[in-house]
Amino acid sequence: MFSLKQPKPSFKSYLLPLQQEDKLNPETKIKKLKPVLLPGEIVVNEVNFVRKCIASDTSQYDLWGKLVCTNFKISFITENSVPFQRFHYKNLLLGEHDVPLTCIEQIVVVNDTKRKQKILSHNQKLKFNPTELIIYCKDFRILRFRFDEAGPESAKKVCLALAHYSQPTDLQLLFAFEYVAQMYHKLDKVNGIDPGGGGDFCQRTPLFESYSDWDREIKRTGASDWRVCSVNEGYMISTCLPEYFVVPSSLADQDLKQYSHAFVGRRMPLWCWNHSNGSALVRMASIKDLLQQRKIDQRVCSGITRSHPLRSEVYKCDLDDNVPSIQDIQAAFSKLRQLCVNEPFDETEEKWLSSLENTRWLEFVRMFLKQAAELVYMLDFSRRSVVLQEEEGRDLSCVVASLVQLMLDPYFRTIIGFQSLIQKEWVMSAYPFLDRCNHLKRSDKESPLFVLFLDCVWQLLQQYPAAFQFTETYLTVVHDSSRISLFGTFMFNSPHQRVQQSTEFAIGKNIQLGEEKGLKFPSVWDWSLQFSAKDRALFNNPLYIGKSVPCVQNGAVKSFKRTKKNYSSTMRGMPPSVKNGMSIQQEIMPRRNSLILKLKPEILQQVPVIPGNGFEQYFRDWFSKPADLHGVILPCLHGTHIQIWKLCYLRWTPEAQINHGGFITAFHKISLLASEIEVLQSRLRQYRAYPMATVTSPVGEQNQMFFRPDELHSSNGSLDILSSSFPFSPIGNLCRRSILGTPLSKFLNGAKIWLSTETLANED
C-alpha cells in the first residue's frame, strides 16, 4: 500500500546540518519514564533507548525515550521537547507522541544490516531483529523509530506486539470494552464524566435512542402527518434499523410488519426530514421481492404522498446509479493517501495537481454535492417528497441525506444540530462504522464514506463560512475521533450490534446492567473527555452570524433575531464583483484559476438537469441573489470551488505549511474582533441593567473565542505560534526531510533572503 523506499530530499540545504552524538548519555533516566494509562489500559510491551526520528536526513532534532505498546495506543515517552514546536492544542486522552491502535494503517520493520524490510501483519513471525520501525497512520501521519541503542530482542517483541494488538480479530478486543468495564466495576468517573459521557455538548445533543427524541424532531420540522413507530422495539423486525423511527401516519404497524421482509435487510422506509412546504426526505433499501416489488413500492409511495399537504408525486432517486460506488470511493481515497503520504515533495511538485486529479477524489466530492443540490431543488422548489434508494440503504444514502439537510436546514449548521444529524443519519441508521473504518482490519469492506461526507461539509464551509457555527478544526477533530477506539459513536455497525456485543461482554465480565440495554459507552460528543474548555473554543466560528436561538413554528425554522440578508460576497470567500458565484461580464484578463470567470451554460450543464423541471433556472435564480445564510445554501460546483482539504490531509507535511500564514492569520484577527464585540455587548447589557453600577468585562472563561484581546501579548495571542496547520503541528509527527535551519526555512520565518551562508552559520 505504501512505498517502502526512503524519501529523497525535499529541500537542499546550503549548510551541513549540525550533527549531534547519536550515543545515548548513560545518565539518562529513560527506564524510569512511565506512560499515562486510562482505566482498563495495560502495558503489553515496551523498549528503552528508542530514538524517534524528526527528520530523515539528520539526527540533530531526534528525540530519545521509551516506546510503549498498550492495548489502546502506541506511546513514545520522552523528557525532551520537540524543537520549533509551539502550539496550544492538547488531547486529554492521548499524549503528544501517542497514536491509537485503530489509527494505524500499516507497520513496516527494517533491518539496515541485512537490508531487509517487511510489512508486519497479525500473528506473523519476524526472522530478523529490526533496527527501524515505520508506522503509517490513517490520518496520514508517518512515525519513524530507531532501535540502534535498544536491545534487539526487546525491539522485536514490541514490534510484534504492536502488529498483534493493532489488528484485532474480534470486536470485543477493542479498548472501549475494557475501559467501560473498569468504569462499571469502579463506579468511578473520568474527568468528572460518567462512562457514557456527560458534558455540555453531549447532554444537549439528541442521540435518537429514545421515542421522545424522534417525536421532538417531528415537531421541530412540522411533520404533522408522520408518526414515531416502535414496531422494531427490541430489534424484533430488523437488526439494521433503530428501535424507533418515523413513518407516514397512514401506514399501520401491521403493514410495516407485512412488507418488511421484502426489503434488503428488512430496512423499511425511514423518514429523515420535513420541509416547511410539506415535502419529506425518505431513505430506504431496495425491494428484493421482485414479484411484489411494484405492489409494495406503490403502497409505500402512496403513504408518503398522503403525508404531503399537496399530495405531490414522490420523486425516487436511485443512488446506486447516480453516484460512485463504495468501492470506487475507497480506490480514490487510497490514491489520495498515496499522494499525500508517500511521494517526496520535489518529485511530485510539478505534477502534483494532475496526480491529485487522477485520484478522482475531488471529482467524487463534487458529484455528491451535485446530487444533493438536485434533491434540494426537488424538495424546495418542486415541493415533491424525495425517496433515496440504494441496495442496503445504509451507505451512500447517509452521505446524500445528510448533505441535503445541511443545505436546507440552518439548524444542522450549528454544532448541536450537526452532531444530532450524524446521530440520526449515521449512528442510529446503522452506517457500518466498524467495517467502513476497518477497525478490525477487514480491508475488503473498508470505504471512507464518512470522511467523504466531512470533506463535502468542509467544501460548503469554505464557500459559506458565515453560515456554520463550527470551524474546520471541529470537522478535523470529528474526523480524528472516528479513529479512536474509545467512543461507542463510531465503533459499531448498528445500534443492535452495540447492544448485543456489549451485553455478551457484560455477562462475561459479571457486570450488572440493570435496566440498561447493553453497556453505556462514552459518546464522542462529550468533548470534555478530549479537550479543555480553552481548546474547545477552537470549535467556535467567529464569522457565524446565526448566533440567535432558532425556533420552529409550523415546521418553519425561524430566528428571534435576524440579520440583514445582503451579506458581503467576500464573507463567502468570493470577490466583491461576484454575486453568489455569478458575474455578468468576464474579466478582460482573467487569472488562470480566477473565481470571477463567467458561469457559462456549459458549466451549469455539469449539474444533472431533469428535463422539464426547471432545475437549471432554479440554480441560476438562486445564484443571482444574495445568499440568506439562515435559509437554503447551494454549493458552487465550478472546478475552482472544489479544493483539497489541506488541514486534514496535509497537516503533517512540513513542505505544505505556511509559517505565520494561511487562513489562521485571518481567523486570529477575526477572533480578536469577535471577542472585543462580545466584551462590549456584555458591558452594554450590564449598563442597561444597572446604569449606576461599575461596568466590568466578562469572565475570560465565558468568552467563546480561542484568541482573546486580554491574551494579545501572551503566547496565545502571538502570531509566532501560527502556521497554516494550526492547531496541529507537522514538526515531530512526520519524518520528512528536514527544512529546519536552511535558508528557505529562515526566509519563511522572517529572515532577510540576502544574508550569506556564513551569516546564517553564525546564528544561534
UniProtKB/Swiss-Prot annotation:
Domain Myotubularin phosphatase: start-end pairs: 208-649
GO biological-process terms attached to the record: phosphatidylinositol dephosphorylation
GO molecular function, one term: phosphatidylinositol-3-phosphate phosphatase activity
InterPro entries: MTMR10_PH-GRAM, MTMR10_PTP, MTMR12-like_C, Myotubularin, Myotubularin-like_Pase_dom, PH-like_dom_sf, Prot-tyrosine_phosphatase-like
One GO cellular component term: membrane
Pfam families in the cross-refs: 3-PAP (PF12578), Myotub-related (PF06602)
Family (UniProt): Belongs to the protein-tyrosine phosphatase family. Non-receptor class myotubularin subfamily.
PANTHER family, alphabetized: MYOTUBULARIN-RELATED, MYOTUBULARIN-RELATED PROTEIN 10
Protein's UniProt name: Myotubularin-related protein 10-B
Organism this protein belongs to: Xenopus laevis (African clawed frog)
Gene from which this protein is expressed: mtmr10-b
